Amino acid sequence: MAFGSEINVVKPRACVLVLPGGRVRSDEASRWWQLANVRMMMVAAALRRRLGRDVEVRRVQYRVRGWNSPRYDAVADAGAALDAVRHRFDPKSIVLVGHSMGGRVAARLAAGGQVGAVLALAPYWPRNDVDLIPASTRLLVVHGTADTRTDPDSSRIQTWRARQRGLDAHWVGIEGVGHFMVRRMGEWHRRTTDFVAEYLQC
């Protein structure tokens, strides 16, 4: 017996994990209303609008706010999120988008060769973290030139070094803009969605 028309369920063909920033050390719970999380909710929403149902966009919610070496709490949480999706997607169809500490988390996750591209927004890379990203990974770094919390010159130099290793790596500066991606918000969103859409051919 038939009950109405068939329902076409769209199965995503790619996945984007959105990784918020945080602190070097903190055991304070990470809450959705904190700026680092709210800002990346907006990035995730922009990605969903641009990419549609063809791409699954997930924002990772860390348990605590800190990087917390040597526990690496944020890496553990993001790694669990990656483990939850990677059995459904080809590694080349998984993109990591990380802001600040989230850019450092992305570099750590990319080291395993299980993702195709990394977009690092104002990344916190204090120890040449870009060196962890395999040469097979595509990389875009976007950094405000007036950022005083993470170093745009360092991320630019590290991106250049990544290119020397064979990565398809590019660095883009947003002139006069600081760390939190509040000024010229539309440009941050446009550069993010353009990169991911072009990489995934959406």
Please report, for each region that a protein language model flagged, where it lies by residue.
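Short beta-strand/loop motif that positions the catalytic acidic residue
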Residues: A135, L140-D147
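Active-site nucleophile loop of the alpha/beta-hydrolase fold
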Residues: G22, A120-R127
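Short, surface-exposed "cap/lid" segments of acyl-processing enzymes
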Residues: M1-G52
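Gly/Ala-rich beta-loop-alpha elbow adjacent to hydrolase catalytic centers
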Residues: V97-G102, A106
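Alpha/beta-hydrolase active-site loop
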Residues: N68-R88
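C-terminal catalytic histidine-bearing segment of alpha/beta-hydrolase fold enzymes
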Residues: R163-C202
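Short alpha-helix in the alpha/beta-hydrolase fold that links the catalytic acid
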Residues: D151-R161
